[in-house]
Amino acid sequence: LDKVFFGAWIELEDEEGEILRYRIVGEDEIDLPHGYISVDAPLARGLIGKFVDDEVTVRLPKGETTYFIAKVQYERPHWDKRPTPEFS
């Protein structure tokens, strides 16, 4: 899939060329240091339904920012260093 939905890992490029990585998750999974953002966050709301190679302008608390969607994936990528929870 190259469309952004809930649960996606996303690589964005900002206007300065910096690569940013996020995962869209539910409220109980938010982990900002690891890039896990709420599905209700302004950034996530602006990305859901968009595709790889789309340019998206999102209104954030700091103002409008434009991002290029470089990659969307639904399997855990190598860069996700968040510990995997252990279930017993």
What are these regions (language model features)?
Residues 1-67, 73:
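Non-DNA-binding regulatory cores of transcription-related proteins
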